[in-house]
Design a protein with these regions (language model features):
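N-terminal cap/lid segment of alpha/beta-hydrolase-fold proteins
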Residues: 114-158
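Alpha/beta-hydrolase fold nucleophile elbow
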Residues: 237-249
Length: 463
């Protein structure tokens, strides 16, 4: 009995002697992206309290809802962000797992401060530039918002052809910055050095641009492009009859929308532009990315069947309230019948269902799923260059390039060029698999071969 008491006493003293107060630093690695996280722990009268910092996101002092430490086990919970960290203190390190939104990632914490990793991006230009660069603002009078961007000219004085760069889906700045890359900065630099002026701008509601991104659809973004054209026509440095559009991903859907209605557009370039209807594209994208991530055929088939039914509801719906009811019932039924389905940590089933319904029924998603690019492409009469990467899993080249070419040809457009670049992904990087998880790990931002081909084609159209 005495030895048992001594053992319990040893455990108690050992636990008491472990000091977890102070700063704990870690790096969260998600799909090649590295995000520094810091937990600041202080002792209270009864237990512990802490805050969380995310230096790379500019966030500091985020309240940690619950901090527990018992027998070397530590747990942090941030309820609002649905974050949970569980770890075990081993000497001067906490070995543990970071959870958020149903996903888990290994992340260890230490006392040592972690400096931001300098990622190599050799293609990004550095100032001073060899050309003229000007920050500009222009108005979208239809939406009553101002948009801010950058206009680059080969020289300050002169008269040049110009392209407007149109970003892909999701809120993005003028450089189309994502996963540590700035594709539009690289494209702009290359084209401007090749005698072509470039206008790139922050999406509405992003950076210095005004407006509400969340409520906008592709049709709304098309009016932003139209206002960019109107602005460029006021600039003496721009050749009014040589204004082109270069759209990436969703931008490759928007460019034809504008070109089909505007005589001011003299050519368009579609970088991984969509050629098939949105609901079909999302299902194809989901299947290819799941395969690349090693998901089983059985799980892929099950997921595709579920989403096909949900997407069909969206495409057929013309009543938003009824749609939300249908979606809610359908997702609840799926969760009831599928015991393997997981609700994200810190989230109730109702909260999870509501999140899914709001995402699928958002204005942007409904518009995208219902929109068939072919109907617009058939009306485009200006020269078109459509290019894709062979390993693009988000906008697969075979289905989309074929659909784009067929629609343009059907409409009588005789100046159509399509090309599939070997070993390039959705961002036009030279890659191994094409999986989105690779994007940030690749030093290259945009294939020099693709840049050269695009620039040469534009030069031919603007001679």
């Amino acid at each position: 009995m005495k030895s048992l008491f001594l053992f319990a006493l040893f455990i108690s003293i050992s636990s008491f002697g472990q000091d977890i107060t102070g700063q704990w630093n870690g790096v969260l690695k998600v799909q090649g992206t590295q995000l520094r996280l810091v937990f600041n722990v202080t002792k209270t009268d009864k237990d512990f309290s802490s805050t969380m910092d995310s230096p790379d996101q500019g966030a500091k002092g985020i309240p940690v809802t619950n901090t527990t430490f018992d027998n070397s086990k530590i747990k942090f919970e941030v309820a609002n962000a649905r974050i949970e960290y569980n770890g075990e203190l081993k000497e001067n390190e906490i070995v543990g797992t970071f959870k958020q939104g149903g996903q888990e990632f290994p992340m260890n914490l230490s006392r040592k401060a972690i400096e931001k990793e300098v990622v190599k991006r050799p293609q990004e230009p550095t100032k001073p530039y060899s050309y003229y660069s000007e920050d500009v603002t222009f108005e979208n009078t239809k939406a009553n918002i101002s948009l801010s961007g950058t206009l680059t000219l080969p020289k300050k004085d002169g008269n040049f052809p110009v392209v407007i760069l149109i970003t892909g889906s999701g809120p993005q700045n003028r450089d189309e910055e994502l996963l540590g890359h700035k594709p539009f900065l690289v494209i702009s630099d290359y084209l401007t050095k090749n005698g072509i002026a470039v206008l790139r701008y922050d999406d509405r509601g992003v950076g210095q641009s005004k407006g509400d991104f969340k409520t906008a659809t592709s049709a709304d973004f098309a009016t932003d492009v139209e206002s960019a054209i109107t602005f460029l026509k006021t600039r003496k440095e721009i050749k009014k009859n040589k204004i082109g559009l270069v759209g990436h991903s969703e931008g490759g859907l928007i460019a034809p929308m504008v070109a089909s209605k505007s005589k001011d557009v003299s050519f368009i370039v579609l970088l991984a532009g969509t050629g098939i209807q949105g609901d079909k594209l999302l299902l194809l994208q989901q299947e290819l990315i799941a395969k690349a991530n090693g998901v089983s055929e059985t799980d892929i088939k099950k997921s595709i069947e579920t989403n096909s039914k949900l997407f069909e509801m969206v495409v057929k719906s013309n009543d938003n309230m009824k749609l939300k009811t249908y979606l809610t019932n359908s997702i609840n039924e799926t969760l009831k019948n599928d015991t393997s389905a997981e609700i994200p940590n810190g989230m109730t089933k109702d909260e999870f269902v509501s999140m899914q319904v709001n995402q699928i029924s958002s204005p942007w998603m409904q518009y995208f799923m219902k929109f068939n690019p072919a109907t617009t492409l058939e009306k485009v009469k200006c020269p078109v260059l459509a290019v894709n990467g062979e390993k693009d899993l988000q906008v697969p080249p075979k289905e989309n390039l074929t659909a784009i070419k067929n629609a343009l040809t059907k409409g009588g457009n005789k100046n159509v060029t399509t090309k599939e670049f070997l070993n390039l992904n959705h961002l036009f990087q030279e890659c191994k698999t094409g999986a989105p998880g690779e994007y940030s790990t690749i030093e290259q931002t945009f294939s020099p071969t693709a840049l050269e081909e695009i620039a040469n084609w534009i030069k031919q159209q603007t001679k």
